[in-house]
Amino acid sequence: MAKSSLGQDSDSTAAVAVLKRAVELDAESRYQQALVCYQEGIDMLLQVLKGTKESSKRSTLRTKISGYMDRAENIKKYLDQEKEDGKYHKQIKIEENATGFSYESLFREYLQETVTEVWIEDPYIRQTHQLYNFLRFCEMLIKKPCKVRTIHLLTSGDEGFGNTQQSSGLEEIKQSLRSHGVVLEINYSSSIHDREIRFNNGWMIKIGRGLDYFKKPQGRFSLGYCDLDLRPCHETTVDIFHNKHTKKI
């Protein structure tokens, strides 16, 4: 059953808004975000086309859709080539006290089914809350559609009493992952400074603060204690690259 004229006008207005945003992002060379908006806007215009009866309007819509599809295809080819050449770079700036940046929100678009191996370099997987951060990251990998089988962790060793806590905590995580068919390889370095995460599908994510970018929750029963999307963050920068040939630690 065709939509009413009012419904079509509403859909058309929404499509125009999304495509206007796509053009703005395109002009700013923010191609990855522009592509998403183009694709969403095109889908919306196709729905409008289905409900349009007047031939002249249908012809106009087809012309617009064709133009947007051509531009989206060109952007996709450009991004694919950037990935092929190892030149792709996207930056996300997390503001002080920003929310909505759980590990799942940040990493989900890069964890395709082809991911089977992950490398993590982070010097600060030592204190209790940092061990929990790493555990949450591992939980995300287990839940995602990817079939992760090996996780490599390179971190720095804690000193004194903290060393026992660190080693026992990581060993417990290792045993837990093993029960899910995942091998955790742990290595220590006293000279490690960089923080980066790599997936064997070519994606590499560098976070200024590593996995430790969440603020301490206000209390054990406050929002954000369990759901990291609700947890305020420290200010940091996330740089995302793509390289077909990811190096191993």
From Swiss-Prot:
It is a peripheral membrane protein. CDD domains: MIT_1, MIT_C. Keywords: Cell cycle, Cell division, Endosome, Membrane, Transport. Gene3D superfamilies: MITD, C-terminal phospholipase D-like domain, Phosphotransferase system, lactose/cellobiose-type IIA subunit. One of its GO terms (biological process) is mitotic cytokinesis. The keyword Cell division applies. It comes from the Eukaryota. It is found in: Late endosome membrane; Midbody; Membrane. Residues 8-86 form the MIT domain. Residues 168-231 are annotated as: Important for association with membranes. Required for efficient abscission at the end of cytokinesis, together with components of the ESCRT complexes. Seems not to be involved in endosomal transport. The C-terminal domain interacts with lipid membranes containing acidic phosphoinositides and is required for location at the midbody. The MIT domain interacts with the MIT-interacting motifs of several components of the ESCRT-III complex. This is MIT domain-containing protein 1. It comes from Rattus norvegicus.
